[in-house]
Amino acid sequence: DGVTIQDSLYAIAHLSDIHANVKVGISFVSMEKAQQNVCPETFDGQLSNLRKAWNEKLSKIEITGTDKQKRMFYTGIYHTMLMPVDKSGENPHFSATPYYDDYYAIWDTYRTSMPLLTLIDEDRQRDMVNSLLNIYEHDGYMPDARSGNWNGRTQGGSNAEIVIADAFAKGMEGINYELALQAMIKDAEVPPMDVDSDSLLDSALRESLAAERHGRGGLKEYNS
């Protein structure tokens, strides 16, 4: 049974010994984009493609050791590549550029997985750096944590700068480092004040809330 309510669809299926394959497309942009995101492959075909893709990623590092040690090592490498998530084309505000979401969170990954990805998956890391700069251009600040197209509530810090510095030190090309420097200087010098200025909150509280969102608290005191 299927029912459509206000552009939403749900279905109730009663199955016994029948094997059912369901294809689902999801999009943050539109229903049309969701339809495009429905995978045309069969389950077995997609499984084969995924195995091939992951083998290509994981085979960039070869180690020796026991089967247990290898399993632990490659499981760790696999986990480093799960987040941030490539959602290019799925941000309704700037869908034409590389876009990564679910940075959780850069104050941990700038010193662990991101320097590793710079070495073993340069294209992905380049896209992530460019995504940080795209977020700066559209939202005003680079995030320290981000999910659901929104900079998350964070502890203080500007760790995206360290990610960019690592890319620059390793000679990564394809990044607008002049724009990156502009973003870094703003992070270091300009306290965020993007909470609605017409709200009933006083300016100090609005500044505190904005700083919490962007992880930019205490800049005035730090720079004084």
Model-derived segments and their meaning:
Residues 1-102, 134, 173-189:
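Acidic/polar, glycine-enriched structural segments that form the non-catalytic walls/loops
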Residues 105-109, 113-224:
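Aromatic-rich carbohydrate-recognition surfaces in CAZymes
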